[in-house]
Amino acid sequence: VIPQMDPVFVTCDFVKGTIDMAYHAQEWELNPENIMHGGIISTALDTSMGFLAHYYTHLSAPTVVTVTMNVTFLKPVLAGDIFHIKCQLDSLGRTLATVKAEVRLERDDILAGIATATFMAVNE
């Protein structure tokens, strides 16, 4: 499903521990309420936060897996909205990385959601 979501890399700052990825809300991602399905938003969050976690843990292990993820939805994402997943590395240990993220709509810079996740570096 991730290729169909067509994520766009916007920025990454290794020193600050941040990444920004953009997504375009598409018709197929809407739920019966005609807003973006929370599971699709969660997939975008997991993908973006996991990408950042992998960036910092890839030297210790080739794979990173999601251990926990907590998402809070604040505002709806509508069809056609462009939204950014802005991630920040919160902590980094030997095998665990914790990342926090915001879902921000381009229209009026609306905060649509927040999330935190912990990822584990594994050697498969």
Q: PLM ranges: what are they?
A:
Residues 39, 43, 47, 68-73, ...:
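Hydrophobic alpha-helical segments of small multi-pass membrane proteins
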Residues 5, 15-19, 63-69, 81-83, ...:
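A generic structural signal for short beta-strands and their flanking turns/coil linkers
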Residues 51-84:
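Hydrophobic beta-strand-centered segment that forms part of the acyl-chain substrate-binding groove
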